[in-house]
Amino acid sequence: MRPGSWRVITHYGFTGPIQRLQAPLRRSLARAAALSTRSYATIPSAPSSQPTSQESSPAASASASASAPATKPRPTYFKDTTLASLDDFIANQSSAAPLAPSEAYTLRTAQVGPAGKKRTITRLPEWLKTPIPSAGANPEFAKIKADLRGLNLHTVCEEARCPNIGECWGGSNKAAATATIMLMGDTCTRGCRFCSVKTSRKPPPLDPHEPENTAEALARWGLGYVVLTSVDRDDLADGGARHFAETIRRIKQKKPTLLVEALTGDFMGDLDMVKIVADSGLDVYAHNVETVENLTPYVRDRRATFRQSLKVLEHVKNVRGKEGIITKTSIMLGLGETEEELWDALRELRKVDVDVVTFGQYMRPTKRHLAVEKYITPDEFELWRQRALDMGFLYCASGPLVRSSYKAGEAFIENVLKKRASERVVSEALGQAVAAEEATSAKSA
């Protein structure tokens, strides 16, 4: 091809050298070639053998040609076939039998990838699909998000890509809305193979204003129950335990009636750091074992072990007493665990008096993370919920979209905490009354 010349080549078969044509003219030529070779889905009706009076009239022909559009309308291709009409659907709706679980929970597959390299993937089950949250559709969602940005706070809801963010942030009222604040930044020193939080050996330093900003945000929202969590900070001497405890104390100072749940790491097994957080005034101490013991080395960071997590949960009870605090943990299903391994994990948790356990479906955040071995059906989640309750757990939230800080369990836990608090008040009042009566009797004698 000579320098300075152009060649238009289209998939319609039109080729030819064109000398320095402008883009609009090249597009016009390509459009003309397309219209001359395009096949339409709709087939025009055969022309009538008998011409009408309008066809025989030159004036009518001129008028029709003047009013005709310059380009042909874009055709519509119908590839799907309708199985039943609307009338048939309405008539059979009342008599239609419900789907069997095997039919309702059938997983769909799809072929993806370029031609010749296609692979089969499993579609996300229908029971795991949630609507995309919108700040415009829910003012409470927008308010919480704006407050977080203004105070430079992070949430595990966003960092871990939680599917419940629209439901928890968009509660119908302030008491229903929940956000799990993630302390000590958004960068973790560990690299668990299921988690999408950023990792680094040297995260940014702690924000000294974070405890006050967190307390201010929570007081502004007017919540009754809040969950605090954090990234692991193995780069700090105390693992961030004092920062965590200071945040809880600030919250309790601003709003003593606010119930606080702290979801902490294992502090590298340092039980003194666990005690610092447990003694800070929180109401629920949560620490997740994440999976069964046999899968822990493959799922969690190698610095975390199943037995180390059990020691953390056990030590909290030793510090605060069995009735003085609620302990909580969470297990992901769908990572390849067996039924017997799950039974063993629950038995070990009961041995250290864990009160609450939650089960949720593991969902792969990105292709770099562990693949999902199995999608657990809602019926299976319900089965494990009942099994956990039968084993003596105080409460169990179990479902495909349940997460460790899922708000569904918080209402129950909140009621338990309030009931225990009222019982303590009654017990103390009764003790004081008995002591006063004994003192009066002693004086009389």
Swiss-Prot record:
Tell me the leader sequence span: none
Question: Which residue intervals make up region (Disordered)?
Answer: 42-77
Q: Where in the cell is it found?
A: Mitochondrion
**Main site of residence?**
mitochondrion
Q: Where is the transit peptide?
A: 1-40
* Residues bound to [4Fe-4S] cluster 1: C157, C162, C168, S405
- SUPFAM superfamilies under this entry? Radical SAM enzymes
Q: Which domain of life is it from?
A: Eukaryota
Catalytic reaction annotation: [[Fe-S] cluster scaffold protein carrying a second [4Fe-4S](2+) cluster] + N(6)-octanoyl-L-lysyl-[protein] + 2 oxidized [2Fe-2S]-[ferredoxin] + 2 S-adenosyl-L-methionine + 4 H(+) = [[Fe-S] cluster scaffold protein] + N(6)-[(R)-dihydrolipoyl]-L-lysyl-[protein] + 4 Fe(3+) + 2 hydrogen sulfide + 2 5'-deoxyadenosine + 2 L-methionine + 2 reduced [2Fe-2S]-[ferredoxin]
Q: E.C. number, please?
A: 2.8.1.8
Annotated GO molecular function terms are: 4 iron, 4 sulfur cluster binding; lipoate synthase activity; metal ion binding
Q: So what family is this one in?
A: Belongs to the radical SAM superfamily. Lipoyl synthase family.
Q: What is this protein called?
A: Lipoyl synthase, mitochondrial
